[in-house]
């Protein structure tokens, strides 16, 4: 059985439903969408397409490198499996690695990144960012994993390994109006981690690592994201502190609503064996 056949039945759909937000992991072969919560009933997914979403929040970006409907293994486009069509583009030699059910994009820590030419959400609160990430060298400073907005223009927010001049390997949360949160959670090089950040209604935040709540940060102002969304860097690169990831990314999900603990744990448990 070849890899394409294997992926066609392993990359199945999962719904983590609640009254306010739904995360959908699309099937590479399509299928029928689930039933939404109070927001209504989900539709029928097409090939690799999304199903329903519910309540006050929804998945606004979903990239899954192991899913051939999201990345077919060649080319410069990674396709968004949410309802919103926020496709991304691979810049400056981002590499694809076929790794069974845990395929990933490889970033060199110098100039590689994936760019989406829009802010996938303009929310300044009630946001979740979830990613499967593996840093090749956690001691490299300023490794931005995902950034929504323009850090150079001091807006938006993101998740990073280290900030400038820091080599601890700690996960940092960045609010673009010059606020860093040090979670104190150190990652190890060449180790896969499921990172999930909730920015709550008051702009305080909760950080989950591998399905466990590891850090909670206080509220702070956030300026509305502008310009774009980026994976593997932020646009704060014209100064002395470049923000490029040296490592691997396999999945990125952004939701315009926070996830419950049970939703985060369910997604972690449903995907962890791929890594």
Which stretches of residues belong to each language-model region?
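Extracytoplasmic low-complexity segments
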Residues: 2-111, 264-275
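Extracellular/lumenal ectodomain signal focusing on beta-strand-rich modules
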Residues: 62, 92-93, 194, 251, ...
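Short, surface-exposed loop/turn microsegments at beta-strand edges and helix-strand junctions
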Residues: 151-153, 220-225
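Extracellular glycan-interaction patches encoded by glycine-rich segments
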Residues: 225-250, 254
């Amino acid at each position: 059985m070849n890899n394409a056949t294997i992926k066609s039945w392993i990359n199945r759909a999962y719904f983590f439903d609640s009254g306010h937000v739904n995360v959908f992991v699309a099937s590479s072969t399509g299928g029928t969408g689930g039933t939404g919560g109070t927001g209504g009933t989900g539709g029928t997914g097409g090939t690799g397409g999304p199903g329903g979403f519910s309540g006050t929040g929804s998945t606004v970006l979903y990239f899954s490198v192991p899913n051939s409907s999201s990345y077919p293994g060649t080319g410069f486009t990674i396709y968004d499996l949410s309802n919103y069509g926020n496709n991304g583009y691979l810049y400056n030699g981002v590499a694809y690695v076929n790794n069974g059910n845990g395929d990933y994009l490889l970033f060199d820590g110098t100039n590689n990144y994936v760019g989406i030419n829009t802010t996938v959400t303009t929310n300044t609160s009630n946001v979740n960012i979830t990613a499967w990430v593996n840093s090749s060298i956690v001691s490299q400073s300023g490794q931005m994993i995902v950034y929504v907005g323009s850090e150079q223009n001091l807006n938006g927010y993101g998740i990073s390994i280290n900030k400038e001049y820091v080599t601890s390997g700690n996960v940092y949360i960045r609010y673009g109006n010059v606020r860093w949160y040090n979670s104190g959670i150190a990652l190890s090089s060449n180790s896969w981690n499921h990172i999930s950040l909730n920015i709550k209604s008051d702009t305080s935040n909760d950080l989950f690592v591998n399905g466990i709540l590891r850090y909670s940060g206080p509220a702070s102002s956030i300026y509305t994201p502008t310009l774009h969304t980026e994976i593997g860097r932020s646009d704060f690169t014209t100064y002395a502190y470049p923000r490029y990831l040296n490592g691997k990314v396999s999945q990125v999900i952004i939701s315009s609503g926070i996830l419950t603990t049970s939703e985060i744990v369910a997604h972690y448990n449903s995907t962890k064996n791929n890594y």
